[in-house]
Design a protein with these regions (language model features):
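Interdomain hinge/linker at the junction between the two RecA-like core domains of SF2 helicases
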Residues: 338-399
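C-terminal helicase lobe and adjacent C-terminal extensions/tails of nucleic-acid helicase motors
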Residues: 325, 393-402, 408, 413-432, ...
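Conserved helicase motor
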Residues: 236-247, 410-413, 434-447, 465-469
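SF2 helicase catalytic motif II
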Residues: 289-323
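Accessory nucleic-acid engagement/destabilization modules that flank
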Residues: 1-126
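Walker A/P-loop
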Residues: 170-192
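Conserved Walker A/P-loop ATP-binding site and its immediately adjacent core
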Residues: 201-224, 238-241
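Inter-Walker segment of RecA-like/P-loop motor cores
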Residues: 227-283
Length: 700
């Protein structure tokens, strides 16, 4: 089956068997001959002919049907996932062998290494010699003198997690639950490096958003003091990062193939990536998805903010991770400040592979450093939608004694409407700089805003969408938020008084119904929100087990309601690879979107962040020329480089948004990204770097 698919995608093994059974003797012989030809005659035609001639095909397949039916009744779920994994592994190794052998032949070279091309040992060594670890080891040696100091408290969490990792080193999955601001990133880095050994030589760091990828790459750079020897061994793998930073003039044409293959097969010792990327590898069915699958074996994978993944497939996620960990010698760390106990969704015997690294999470969550960091206030919350004017008056009153104020809306249009109101308020704009941050903002603008709000001397009011909940490292005095799900509210509280050096306050209000924004979300659909006194109590006491037990119970009930043909076990048993990928989509594709390239003038703040000005039209021309490149590897590598610069000009709009199409200079079909429409006079759609055209929501 794997051989027959190596020029295509894994689809359904069940359909493959049925297709074979329907074919006549001549077609089967033809298929087998094709296999022989594609494998350089490894299977000789005369042997195949005798095999077919002396065998009654119908009898053979009737026997196979009976055998499969009987086998299905006796095979365990563990055997099913093992066969599923083996099939995917064989397919991945076959593709890799094919690609490497072809590349060796075409380039007349010999590959000696088919895995990590970097040096993981230098990362381990430099980490142990870093200032932060020296400080932690010093505290470990001399004891923690003052637990009210937040850094000492972080050290306590760090050391407890390290101790429990050693105690449970035979487990495959580790849960790390600790409060926001407690140093989880550094703790997880230490744990992942501890899990490396002679056979386990690769680390994956997985985040739900590109903003988190960027933020944590910066954290790693800070930990390693921008040591180039370390940083060059850490690769960011996502849709917005170039495959190489080298100028095309410095890359020999034959090197493009190596750069592309390193990315396709993830030939790096330490990878920082997104959940979409890693799950394409974990459960994807296309050739491109499966290329690096074999690299997951003998690795360490760290998942951050897993509660942000689509909760309707939590059960499938933990089942896949648990099985792969056992079968492929993977160690998995799952961490969050709001961590659901996903082991509840597993069978009893499967839970034995999971260990908690913090034994008594209440000791930390209920400590006054974290628990009382933010006072929650419900004066503005009622089931009647709040008026903008009432919200504005409340903010004006609080602005007198607050330097940093954050207001989060869950609808981008609401954020933009309120931003205009705040900008026009003399009471607010006379003392505070008014800023807005949404999902449509590019990296340069986002970083500029973060710097402003983290500047101790600046007074700032930031209006934002829910992207602020994770992946944006800011610290404010007061926060206002449109309610949604309880897990979202806790993530929002993590943006307030992060330093724990002052008193912070959060005000919740109701304006937009979360059900209109969050589709197919168990938490939102079941009203697990702050209208409930029970949920208010959970948020106050940080007892998220009560909250998540309700969510997990709903998921378990829904799983029982699924038909036998539709459930996870049946899909795995029948090896329906394509169907599994469809059912485990982390992000639903929005087909009502169009991508536009606005040729606009970058703001001074954007230019400062980028380090140079970028001419949109010149970037567009380079992009069009790259699309004409005939060398495939060079084309893909150069596209990844130009795409980094295009991100400052690319925006997604709903198809029904009306723009002045007389500004369009070209409409070009892109093989990978679909249609991109070029708008030449882009400046008229922007004010101070903020898109102001149309009502269509682009992102969140």
């Amino acid at each position: 089956y794997a051989i027959s698919k190596h020029h295509g995608n894994l689809e359904s093994f069940e359909e493959y068997i049925e297709k074979l059974a329907r074919n006549n003797e001549e077609n089967i012989l033809k298929d087998l001959k094709n296999i022989s030809v594609s494998n350089n005659g490894i299977l000789r035609d005369e042997i195949l002919y005798k095999l077919i001639k002396n065998e009654d095909i119908n009898t053979y397949f009737n026997f196979m049907d009976v055998y499969i039916s009987i086998r299905k009744e006796h095979i365990s779920s563990q055997e099913s996932i093992a066969i599923f994994t083996l099939t995917k592994m064989m397919f991945s190794l076959l593709i890799a062998s094919d690609y490497y052998s072809t590349s060796e032949f075409m380039q007349e070279i010999k590959y000696e290494n088919f895995g990590n091309m970097g040096n993981i040992d230098i990362i381990k060594r430099e980490y142990e010699n870093s200032e932060i670890i020296k400080s932690i080891r010093n505290i470990e040696k001399n004891g923690i003198s003052n637990e009210k100091d937040i850094n000492n408290f972080r050290t306590k969490i760090f050391l407890e997690a390290e101790k429990n990792l050693e105690k449970n080193k035979n487990s495959n999955i580790f849960f790390l639950e600790a409060p926001t601001g407690s140093g989880k990133s550094n703790t997880a880095l230490n744990l992942s490096l501890k899990l490396l050994n002679e056979n386990r030589r690769k680390i994956f760091y997985v985040y739900p958003f590109n903003t988190l990828v960027e933020q944590n790459m910066n954290t790693l750079k800070n930990i390693f003091a921008n040591n180039e020897k370390v940083i060059e061994n850490i690769a960011v793998v996502n849709s917005v990062t170039a495959l190489t930073t080298k100028d095309s003039r410095d890359i020999p044409i034959e090197k493009y193939s190596n750069i592309l293959m390193d990315r396709q097969f993830l030939n790096y010792p330490f990878i920082v990536t997104t959940h979409v990327g890693i799950f394409n590898t974990l459960i994807g069915n296309t050739k491109e998805d499966c290329m690096p699958f074999y690299q997951l074996a003998n690795s360490v994978i760290v998942f951050d903010e897993i509660q942000a993944y689509k909760n309707t497939i939590w059960r499938e996620i933990i089942s896949i991770l648990n099985s792969y960990a056992k079968l492929l010698n993977i160690k998995i760390i799952i961490m969050s400040a709001t961590l659901p106990d996903l082991s509840y969704l597993l069978d009893h015997e499967e839970k034995n592979n999971i260990a908690r690294l913090i034994e008594n999470r209440d000791e930390y969550f209920n400590n006054e450093i974290f628990k009382n960091r933010v006072e929650v206030n419900y004066d503005l919350l009622s089931k009647k939608k709040i008026e903008y004017t009432k919200l504005l008056e409340h903010i004006i009153e609080n602005s007198l004694n607050s330097k940093k104020i954050l207001i989060e809306f869950i609808c981008k249009n609401s954020a933009k409407e309120f931003y205009e109101l705040v900008k026009d308020s003399e009471e607010l704009n006379i003392n505070h700089e008014i800023l807005i941050l949404t999902g449509e903002d590019n990296k340069a603008r986002r970083n500029s805003i973060i710097k402003k709000i983290n500047n101790k001397d600046k007074k700032v009011i930031l209006i934002s969408t829910q992207l602020i909940e994770a992946g944006v490292d800011i610290d404010v005095d007061i926060g206002y938020k449109n309610i949604s799900g309880l897990d979202n509210e806790e993530q929002f509280l993590g943006r307030i008084n992060r330093s724990c050096k002052k008193n912070g306050t959060a005000y919740f209000f109701y304006l937009t119904d979360a059900k209109k924004v969050y589709k197919n979300n168990i938490i939102i659909e079941n009203n697990l929100n702050l209208f409930s006194d029970e949920m208010k109590d959970v948020l106050k006491n940080k007892n998220f087990d009560i909250f998540y037990s309700k969510v997990l119970e709903i998921l378990k009930r829904k799983e029982k309601e699924k038909s036998s043909e539709d459930n996870f076990e049946t899909i795995i048993y029948n090896k329906k690879f394509r169907l599994l990928k469809e059912k485990m989509k982390l992000i639903e594709e929005q087909e009502d979107k169009k991508t536009y390239f606005f040729n606009r003038t970058l703001t001074d703040e954007e230019i400062e962040e980028i380090g140079t000005n970028i001419d949109g039209y010149e970037i567009w021309k380079k992009y069009v020329n790259i699309l004409k490149e005939e060398n495939y590897a060079k084309k893909i590598v150069e596209l990844s480089k130009i795409r980094e610069k295009m991100m400052y000009f690319l925006y997604e709009l709903k198809k029904d948004v009306e723009l002045n199409y007389s500004d369009i200079k070209g409409d070009i079909k892109v093989d990978i990204k679909g249609s991109i429409i070029y708008i030449d006079d882009g400046d008229k759609y922007f004010t101070d770097g903020v898109y102001n055209g149309g009502k269509g929501d682009m992102f969140i």
